[in-house]
Regions:
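Hydrophobic alpha-helical segments typical of transmembrane helices
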Residues: 7, 15, 35, 49, ...
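Rossmann-fold NAD(P) dinucleotide-binding segment
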Residues: 50-114
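Acidic, glycine-centered active-site loop in nucleotide-sugar glycosyltransferases
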Residues: 40-43, 76, 85-87, 128-131
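NAD(P)+-binding Rossmann beta1-loop-alpha1 motif at the extreme N-terminus of oxidoreductases
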Residues: 1-62, 88, 93-94, 124
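Short, well-ordered coil/turn elements that cap or connect secondary structure elements
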Residues: 21, 41-42, 85, 110, ...
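Short amphipathic alpha-helical segments
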Residues: 16-18, 40, 72-75, 102-106, ...
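Residues in the short beta-alpha loop(s) of Rossmann-like NAD(P)-binding domains
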Residues: 32, 66, 139
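Rossmann-fold dinucleotide-binding core
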Residues: 96-173
Length: 173
């Protein structure tokens, strides 16, 4: 399965590094061209346009800094789904509220793809060391297909049930 990763910030960089070092066929996209270039030097496919990443990925993981960026990336006019008609698995590792996850999930499902909300804990050190805890909500089959990649980034992977349940659990603490 071809993996795309969007967002190479404090958490995303370590997560993407672990995917790459564990053998994932990885494409990356982020706002910083320097970060894309650095990942190319490590062996990832650098995507300087979102469309390139979407068209070269079956599984798309994103780790973004805020609600507005997540919504724009997922539901925006030039977001992920505007570049494909093929079924994709979209995983949101961003820290967003349950309502945002619901909006994203409903939109992605309406476009024929699947959505997993997958909040993470462990901080930048856990992301770098591959010891994150990842709670996942959404389609069980999509979770099973994605699980080997979660295991490349974390040591505790927990399926929480249906869509939004992982985010609801995270926000309850």
């Amino acid at each position: 399965m071809k993996v795309g990763f969007i967002g190479l910030g404090n958490m995303g960089q370590g997560m993407a590094d672990n995917l790459l070092s564990n053998g994932a066929e990885l494409s990356v996209f982020t706002r910083s061209k320097d970060k894309i270039s650095a990942m190319e030097n490590k062996g990832a496919k650098g995507c300087y346009e979102l469309e390139d990443l979407v068209q070269n990925s079956d599984l798309i993981l994103n780790c973004l800094p805020d609600v507005n960026t997540s919504l724009d990336l997922i539901t925006g006019d030039k977001g992920i789904m505007s570049y494909t008609k093929e079924k994709k698995i979209i995983v949101d590792h961003s820290t967003v509220d349950v309502l945002t996850s619901k909006k994203c999930s409903k939109y992605i499902l309406s476009q024929g793809s699947t959505f997993l909300d997958a909040p993470i804990s462990g901080g930048p050190v856990g992301a770098k060391d591959g010891t994150l805890s990842i709670m996942v909500g959404g389609d069980k089959d999509s979770f099973e297909k994605s699980k080997p990649f979660f295991e490349m980034m974390g040591t505790t992977i927990k399926y929480m049930g249906g869509a939004w349940e992982a985010g609801a659990y995270e926000w309850s603490y």
